[in-house]
């Protein structure tokens, strides 16, 4: 297997993630101006629900493929993962198309229906691409996923403007980003297959035992991500209703969701450029190590994530005025950016804990903290978003709930750094 250092892989992935996030950030700015806050809010409602269908095939399975590929020299993990992603992705895509009218009703806004329909193929496309990404990370090949991800984001950016036909309704404008995402995912998967055509394993017989092992490894992380995604969908549907209860007009409440989820939170997630790259390179690296080398690697990964979180917090707080006034041209966003800035540190620490637990095959320990944090988020959003705090109440709910789940995860992860607690990496026997 062609091996690269963890630092080199993380650097490649960080550069790719940086370019992707930069394009994504620019896309959100353009969409905010091009679609309008109300259409952006409708899109965010639909997208939060759409992620529920994508998460089962993009969350735990790629990590499991990466971990098993790092321990094996053949391509059996890719073959098994690809088969699982194909079957699950196709079934979920068809189910999503059939249930979209019901989901639009549950979201409380029928204008989300076109956006739900046009993004349905992403379920299958994203699942297949994610498995190939996991295979590449396990083999120490970060470049193919990096180029594919860049292609997907660039295609989304370039296609949004041509797809925006003059005279579209709010529902039609809200469907534009989803259509561009589907086309971008198709282009990215095609490029990925082209780049990997010479290094993919030959046709292998179906290995049900390996498929079962992949499922067992992926289920805890998939469950955790599903809970997180479901919480975002529920909060996206709950927040405008609670803002209306606080006295805000319905159209203004929908626009407020666009401000928070379409403008503020994408900036808060920007430091994830580095922490996600550290995690993607770190999981297979941890799976290959044991003893002192394992503990040393875990400590380095955790320290790097902590530094990224602190720097991100400081940067967003310091640049809040520039982001609000110059980038988004929404002066009211300055206070929201400052209030939400601590989330960057919490997300970085959560990523570090998840990386350590996933690398050691103990990702199930993230499930209960995530469940408790999600329940707390819904309760606090229900109460505080309807108070005079409004959007600031929703941000405070995010901070408190995330802090609880992250501290819980750290309590499970940090003891694994001690010599007596750190388990050895599983062998291939």
Task: Please annotate each region the language model reported.
Residues 147-162, 169-199, 373-376, 391-415:
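Hydrophobic alpha-helical transmembrane segments
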Residues 10-20, 116-117, 121, 136-161, ...:
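Alpha-helical transmembrane segments of multi-pass membrane transporters/permeases
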Residues 59-101, 114, 292-312:
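Membrane-water interface segments that mark the loop-to-transmembrane alpha-helix transition
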Residues 5-62, 93-97, 122, 219-242, ...:
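Signature of the first transmembrane helix
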